[in-house]
């Protein structure tokens, strides 16, 4: 198994900052925006975007944590640990995740969102888009496009969970 670091901590920080600037540029009314991180690493990325938005615009946007497990199509989980402290009805919700791959995680996240309310708009921000979609889903904000083969894996590490920030590509062959 071969592992290669393709994004270091500095590059990851820059990608998150770029996503934050794009959110500012594309959303005229930031006061109507809610950030929704997909557990687990998407939540920490959402918090970082929230912090950058505060630094750049002086805004404290609400943030939620989406648990997609009860909404997945390949497993059955009863407990839903979603934390959404704000009513998302009529809001512009930005889903945030670490990697966009087949699109199934995002589909489950959207199912979770609409179970909570009726957002005015839903957009998607991801740190890494690796391709290989199985569903017609695309990201509105992308930190890095990293094409992979179907056997390779993208591993995102964040300091809050893994002790360091980096993105690696793993080839199991």
From Swiss-Prot:
Q: Which UniProt keywords apply?
A: Glycosyltransferase, RNA-binding, Transcription, Transcription regulation, Transcription termination, Transferase
UniProt xrefs under InterPro entries: PRibTrfase_dom, PRTase-like, PyrR, PyrR_bifunctional
Q: Alphabetically, which GO biological process terms does the record hold?
A: DNA-templated transcription termination
Pfam families referenced in this protein's UniProt entry, alphabetically: Pribosyltran (PF00156)
Q: Name one GO molecular function term.
A: uracil phosphoribosyltransferase activity
Family matches, as CDD domains = PRTases_typeI
Record's catalysed reaction(s): UMP + diphosphate = 5-phospho-alpha-D-ribose 1-diphosphate + uracil
EC code? 2.4.2.9
Leader peptide range in chain numbering: none
**Quaternary context:** Homodimer and homohexamer; in equilibrium.
Q: Which HAMAP family match?
A: PyrR (MF_01219)
The task this protein performs is described as: Regulates transcriptional attenuation of the pyrimidine nucleotide (pyr) operon by binding in a uridine-dependent manner to specific sites on pyr mRNA. This disrupts an antiterminator hairpin in the RNA and favors formation of a downstream transcription terminator, leading to a reduced expression of downstream genes. Also displays a weak uracil phosphoribosyltransferase activity which is not physiologically significant.
- NCBIfam families in the record: PRK05205.1-4, PRK05205.1-5
Q: What protein name applies here?
A: Bifunctional protein PyrR
């Amino acid at each position: 198994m071969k592992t290669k670091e393709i994004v270091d901590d500095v590059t990851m920080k820059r990608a998150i900052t770029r996503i934050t600037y794009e959110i500012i540029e594309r959303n005229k009314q930031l006061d109507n925006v809610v950030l929704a991180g997909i557990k687990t690493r998407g939540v920490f990325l959402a918090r970082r975007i929230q912090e950058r938005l505060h630094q750049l615009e002086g805004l404290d946007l609400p943030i939620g944590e989406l648990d997609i497990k009860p909404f997945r199509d390949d497993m059955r989980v009863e407990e839903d640990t979603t934390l959404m402290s704000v009513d998302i009805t009529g809001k512009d919700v930005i889903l945030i995740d670490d990697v966009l791959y087949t699109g199934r995680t995002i589909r489950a996240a959207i199912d979770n969102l609409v179970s909570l309310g009726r957002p005015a708009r839903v957009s998607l921000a991801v740190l890494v888009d690796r391709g290989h979609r199985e569903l017609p889903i695309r990201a509105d904000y992308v930190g890095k496009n990293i094409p992979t083969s179907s056997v390779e894996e993208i591993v995102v590490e964040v300091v809050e969970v893994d002790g360091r920030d980096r993105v690696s590509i793993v080839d199991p062959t």
